[in-house]
UniProtKB/Swiss-Prot annotation:
<dbReference type="GO" id="GO:0005832">
    <property type="term" value="C:chaperonin-containing T-complex"/>
</dbReference>
<comment type="similarity">
    <text>Belongs to the TCP-1 chaperonin family.</text>
</comment>
<protein>
    <recommendedName>
        <fullName>T-complex protein 1 subunit gamma</fullName>
        <ecNumber>3.6.1.-</ecNumber>
    </recommendedName>
</protein>
<feature type="binding site">
    <location>
        <position position="66"/>
    </location>
    <ligand>
        <name>Mg(2+)</name>
    </ligand>
</feature>
<feature type="binding site">
    <location>
        <position position="15"/>
    </location>
    <ligand>
        <name>ATP</name>
    </ligand>
</feature>
<keyword id="KW-0378">Hydrolase</keyword>
<keyword id="KW-0963">Cytoplasm</keyword>
<keyword id="KW-0479">Metal-binding</keyword>
<dbReference type="InterPro" id="IPR027413">
    <property type="entry name" value="GROEL-like_equatorial_sf"/>
</dbReference>
<dbReference type="GO" id="GO:0051082">
    <property type="term" value="F:unfolded protein binding"/>
</dbReference>
<keyword id="KW-0143">Chaperone</keyword>
<dbReference type="InterPro" id="IPR002423">
    <property type="entry name" value="Cpn60/GroEL/TCP-1"/>
</dbReference>
<keyword id="KW-0460">Magnesium</keyword>
<feature type="binding site">
    <location>
        <position position="69"/>
    </location>
    <ligand>
        <name>ADP</name>
    </ligand>
</feature>
<keyword id="KW-0067">ATP-binding</keyword>
<feature type="binding site">
    <location>
        <position position="15"/>
    </location>
    <ligand>
        <name>ADP</name>
    </ligand>
</feature>
<feature type="binding site">
    <location>
        <position position="67"/>
    </location>
    <ligand>
        <name>ATP</name>
    </ligand>
</feature>
Length: 82
């Protein structure tokens, strides 16, 4: 359920009509972004499945450099039908 929540948060950041998200950074400042990778870097999660989703995104970014939002949405959909 936590991994699906991560996918639902990131889902609206994909495509030409993506929506901006407002985040609080560790210093208390407001960050507005529609970059899925930036959002996943800023959020803190405790659930192991959600941590795995974020690790998938980081690996995608390191190996390919793009597609972090897509890989999270794809993994979330795979978990929802499992």
């Amino acid at each position: 359920n936590a991994a699906k929540t991560i996918a639902d948060i990131i889902r609206t950041c994909l495509g030409p009509k993506s929506m901006m998200k407002m985040l609080l950074d560790p210093m208390g400042g407001i960050v507005m972004t529609n970059d899925g990778n930036a959002i996943l870097r800023e959020i803190q999660v405790q659930h192991p499945a959600a941590k795995s989703m974020i690790e998938i995104s980081r690996t995608q970014d390191e190996e390919v450099g793009d597609g972090t939002t897509s890989v999270i949405i794809l993994a979330g959909e795979m978990l929802s039908v499992a």
